[in-house]
Amino acid sequence: MDDFTSISLLSLAMLVGCYVSGIIPLAVNFSEEKLKLVTVLGAGLLCGTALAVIVPEGVHALYEEALEAKHHEMGEIHKVKDAETGAEASVAHEHDHSNLHAYIGVSLVLGFVFMLLVDQIGSSHMHSADDPEAARAASSKITTTLGLVVHAAADGVALGAAASTSQTSVQLIVFVAIMLHKAPAAFGLVSFLMHAGLERNRIRKHLLVFALAAPLLSMLTYLGLSKSSKEALSEVNATGVAMLFSAGTFLYVATVHVLPEVGGMGHSHKQDLGAAKGLSRLEVCALVLGCLIPLVLSIGHQH
């Protein structure tokens, strides 16, 4: 199977899987209490996914690409010279690893800051409305969807970059990693939007945009890369960097938007402490369970 066919099939599977998992909360009629519980579970899934799946997968992709490049280089060097002192090699190895550490931090922070700026720009437009509370709620819904779409787009770039390496194992690892968090993310997004009171048709549109973002970007990335760009991308570990950038956007959405909203605290700066009741014991259990599910799935998916 050639690369184009495989990336097309993976993109289609990603679209269908994501949309179907997002439709589940819409297909079932929940009472107010159950909806809150499902929303809390969804928020837990988003946080657990960001921390237990996306960050480790991004780091893994980053180091795996570097190690493969290193093995290739070492093979070439051994062909030319068999006898070499190991001191220089170990210094170069340490230097490479410090570079990779920098990539990890920079990618995560850039993703987080990018979403922070998008949020601030969005809310500054929204807050000019007559009702600041309604404006805040609308801004929160839009930012949550936008954040997850940006995150999904970065995932798509990661998959497209992985497909361009022509290594099926890397493609499959990135695909499984993306699917492991896209399904819970779609579920979390829809349950959050339902909790926020969006109409079902609008929710379906939000979900469709989220589901389409990664497949479209993966195809565009794959088709848009020339041979020279592919080589340049493998030099800067594009797959790992894209996944870590998306992890930064994901962390922002999960922690700054969804969790406070679910906890009843929102972004509202109310002085009335009674309004921020927090979560019941059952809801806390659902939140913890949501955080643990991606962890269990990621342990099951060992490389």
From Swiss-Prot:
The keyword Transport applies. It comes from Xenopus laevis (African clawed frog). This is Zinc transporter ZIP9-B. Glycans are attached at N29, N237. Keywords: Cell membrane, Cytoplasm, Glycoprotein, Golgi apparatus, Ion transport, Membrane, Mitochondrion, Nucleus, Transmembrane, Transmembrane helix, Transport, Zinc, Zinc transport. The lineage of its organism: Eukaryota, Metazoa, Chordata, Craniata, Vertebrata. Transports zinc ions across cell and organelle membranes into the cytoplasm and regulates intracellular zinc homeostasis. Participates in the zinc ions efflux out of the secretory compartments. Regulates intracellular zinc level, resulting in the enhancement of AKT1 and MAPK3/MAPK1 (Erk1/2) phosphorylation in response to the BCR activation. Also functions as a membrane androgen receptor that mediates, through a G protein, the non-classical androgen signaling pathway, characterized by the activation of MAPK3/MAPK1 (Erk1/2) and transcription factors CREB1 or ATF1. InterPro entries: ZIP, ZIP9. The keyword Metal-binding does not apply.
